[in-house]
Design a protein with these regions (language model features):
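Short, structured "edge-of-domain" segments at secondary-structure transitions
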Residues: 1-343
């Protein structure tokens, strides 16, 4: 959150059984925490989106490759941030590939779709990407083909899945429309695509998580309250991150506020229903909590590892793990009208 960045090769972290503590991934100060974890090639562009609705970019090779214990370099050494401006989201884009759209989502549930070609010629001082309401910020940017299904996930375990055609393509500097109707005190924690045959992996702040096929989530119209994606309680903590798994993804990495990383096989994560709580994925230290997830497949790695299968530990199963999908569907009157944010 204080604006440091770095890169490491994935095989810095060997696969572990789920439920472990992990190992050091990034040095942080007491008043700092890890915010983004993602996979990239050194030839890709890293697009940095800020709390002021701007985007700047640099080549991934400009990010320092350092050890897990190192903090990295300040982003201000790589791109032209304004005083007190903070990076809230990072998107990795292949060089020269300007097809499709970018769909933005904010912490307060606003969404917007813009042609990626609008960002083909980024100036050194960046470009305006979205007009934001006071106190809101861009949390996620998903690249789409124009025919994709997308989903928002909230801290209280709600999710809404909708087709991107529900969103008209708008100009680069325009505001957003309502993606999900949030209860008071709730906020969006993840915005992900829903690939055919894929699944949603989500995790609570205390390291409890699960995997649910996207087929368990019905397609809705944007703007409603959504359906229950996870049951939460004091043991699970609030949902803090979610990632969309494709059939090609083999590995999952989770990182905590204090920079501890664990890498495991996707197949180790139990597949269960929407209203289940899940199993222990990671065991954060006292005072620490999980903050981010990332998934990747063999194409992202320089090697392929095969580990022995992990048996399900009965002590890690939580009450309510029946996987019953019958509860908590939102009613039809939860669908909201478009809310346009005036520039």
């Amino acid at each position: 959150e204080r604006g440091y960045t770095k890169r490491m090769v994935p095989d810095t972290y060997v696969q572990q059984s789920r439920g472990g503590r992990g190992r050091r991934g990034m040095a942080t100060r007491d008043d700092d925490r890890v915010k983004v974890l993602t996979l990239a090639s050194t030839h890709d562009w890293a697009m940095f989106f800020t709390d002021r609705g701007r985007v700047l970019r640099t080549r991934v090779w400009n990010l320092p490759e350092v050890s897990p214990a190192a903090r990295g370099t300040s982003i201000v050494n790589l791109v032209s941030l304004e005083p007190d401006e903070k990076v809230t989201c990072v998107l990795i884009v292949r060089d020269g590939d300007m097809s499709g759209n970018l769909v933005f989502a904010t912490r307060r549930g606003e969404i917007k779709r813009t042609a990626i070609s609008d960002f083909a010629h980024l100036r050194q001082n960046g470009l305006k990407t979205m007009d934001l309401e006071e106190g809101d910020e861009i949390g996620w940017v998903v690249r789409t083909s124009g025919n994709d299904r997308l989903a928002l996930v909230t801290a209280r375990g709600m999710s809404i899945s909708f087709h991107e055609s529900d969103l008209r393509v708008s100009g680069r500097t325009s505001g957003g429309v309502r993606g999900i109707r949030l209860d008071e005190g709730d906020e969006v924690v993840s915005f992900v695509p829903c690939p055919p045959g894929g699944s949603l992996v989500l995790i609570g702040q205390n390291g409890i998580g699960k995997q649910t096929p996207w087929s368990r989530f019905r397609l809705q119209t944007r703007g409603g309250k959504g359906v229950r994606a996870a049951a939460i309680n004091d043991r699970t903590g609030s949902i803090v991150a979610a990632v969309s798994i494709t059939p090609e993804d083999t590995d999952l990495m989770a990182i905590t506020r204090n920079g501890i990383v664990i890498r495991m096989q996707v197949s180790d994560i139990r597949v269960c229903g929407r209203v289940a709580r899940g199993v222990r994925i990671m065991r954060p230290d006292a005072g620490d909590e999980v903050v981010a997830l990332s998934a990747f497949g063999p194409d992202n790695l320089d090697f392929v590892e095969v580990s022995a299968p992990v048996e399900l530990d009965p002590e890690d199963l939580l009450e309510g793990d029946s996987g019953d999908d019958s509860a908590d569907d939102a009613s039809a009157d939860d669908v909201a009208e478009d809310v346009t944010v005036t520039p």
